[in-house]
Amino acid sequence: MSALNLTVRVHPVVLFQVVDAFERRNADSHRVIGTLLGSVDKGVVEVTNCFCVPHKEHDDQVEAELSYALDMYELNRKVNSNESVVGWWATGNEVTNHSSVIHEYYARECNNPVHVTVDTSLQGGRMGLRAYVCIQLGVPGGKSGCMFTPIPVELTSYEPETFGLKLLQKTVGVSPAHRPKTVPPMLDLAQISEASTKLQSLLDLILKYVDDVIAHKVTPDNAVGRQLLDLIHAVPHMTHEQFTQMFNANVRDLLMVITLSQLIKTQLQLNEKLTFLPTA
């Protein structure tokens, strides 16, 4: 498969590790680089982990601790044997002159390595994320070179990662003095209420976007339109009475599960107290 047909999917933990490595960099380091770990399947490069590689960049050369990178990879293989080298990352919003030299090393470690750049300067208030592959250029018998070509990149996450991100969002904007050290699990009904409130706010946002497009206040985006059409087609066709009946049945089932779980919890607590009662 051609390298240009690859798509990169990056997990949140990778971005957290990149930012952490950037914050811990040496004072004389302008950027940080590291190894990307993950898997490749059917043209999709899924990046699930990474680590930093110490290096120094000079005007005419790059010094990287390759032995450190090899040791880190071997240690990671003992814990996550399904993760392999898929490319490398660097902080910044552009490809530098030294990028081709670093890419040559990773080209020996894996087939079609990808290069991901993370803009930790937060230009425009966003963390820019880009992915590249290196395409060989040249003529037979002449000089050859390479060119970094952008490829699609997107963020993805497993369900536990999504849940963790939602918990982190609750502490955004909270001062350290008032920030809770622990986040207790929410009750089932509280989770339903919170999810319903968020769904209502998202629906209001979509309706506002559609109204602005109809009023020619916003330039329409074909990709957004196709996604909205897919959402409409995904909604099951049923009457209001059928939906109400189905919703009420699910709520009754949920309440029954909550009641039974509370009874089991009470029984376990009572059994624990009876077990530790002093015997005459």
UniProtKB/Swiss-Prot annotation:
<dbReference type="GO" id="GO:0050829">
    <property type="term" value="P:defense response to Gram-negative bacterium"/>
</dbReference>
<comment type="similarity">
    <text>Belongs to the eIF-3 subunit F family.</text>
</comment>
<dbReference type="InterPro" id="IPR037518">
    <property type="entry name" value="MPN"/>
</dbReference>
<dbReference type="GO" id="GO:0001732">
    <property type="term" value="P:formation of cytoplasmic translation initiation complex"/>
</dbReference>
<comment type="function">
    <text>Component of the eukaryotic translation initiation factor 3 (eIF-3) complex, which is involved in protein synthesis of a specialized repertoire of mRNAs and, together with other initiation factors, stimulates binding of mRNA and methionyl-tRNAi to the 40S ribosome. The eIF-3 complex specifically targets and initiates translation of a subset of mRNAs involved in cell proliferation.</text>
</comment>
<protein>
    <recommendedName>
        <fullName>Eukaryotic translation initiation factor 3 subunit F-1</fullName>
    </recommendedName>
</protein>
<dbReference type="Pfam" id="PF01398">
    <property type="entry name" value="JAB"/>
</dbReference>
<dbReference type="GO" id="GO:0045747">
    <property type="term" value="P:positive regulation of Notch signaling pathway"/>
</dbReference>
<feature type="domain" description="MPN">
    <location>
        <begin position="8"/>
        <end position="138"/>
    </location>
</feature>
<dbReference type="GO" id="GO:0033290">
    <property type="term" value="C:eukaryotic 48S preinitiation complex"/>
</dbReference>
<dbReference type="InterPro" id="IPR027531">
    <property type="entry name" value="eIF3f"/>
</dbReference>
<dbReference type="Pfam" id="PF13012">
    <property type="entry name" value="MitMem_reg"/>
</dbReference>
<dbReference type="GO" id="GO:0071541">
    <property type="term" value="C:eukaryotic translation initiation factor 3 complex, eIF3m"/>
</dbReference>
<dbReference type="GO" id="GO:0003743">
    <property type="term" value="F:translation initiation factor activity"/>
</dbReference>
<comment type="subunit">
    <text>Component of the eukaryotic translation initiation factor 3 (eIF-3) complex. The eIF-3 complex interacts with pix.</text>
</comment>
<keyword id="KW-0648">Protein biosynthesis</keyword>
<keyword id="KW-0396">Initiation factor</keyword>
<dbReference type="InterPro" id="IPR024969">
    <property type="entry name" value="EIF3F/CSN6-like_C"/>
</dbReference>
<dbReference type="GO" id="GO:0061059">
    <property type="term" value="P:positive regulation of peptidoglycan recognition protein signaling pathway"/>
</dbReference>
<dbReference type="GO" id="GO:0031369">
    <property type="term" value="F:translation initiation factor binding"/>
</dbReference>
<dbReference type="GO" id="GO:0140492">
    <property type="term" value="F:metal-dependent deubiquitinase activity"/>
</dbReference>
<dbReference type="InterPro" id="IPR000555">
    <property type="entry name" value="JAMM/MPN+_dom"/>
</dbReference>
<dbReference type="GO" id="GO:0016282">
    <property type="term" value="C:eukaryotic 43S preinitiation complex"/>
</dbReference>
<keyword id="KW-0963">Cytoplasm</keyword>
<dbReference type="GO" id="GO:0140367">
    <property type="term" value="P:antibacterial innate immune response"/>
</dbReference>
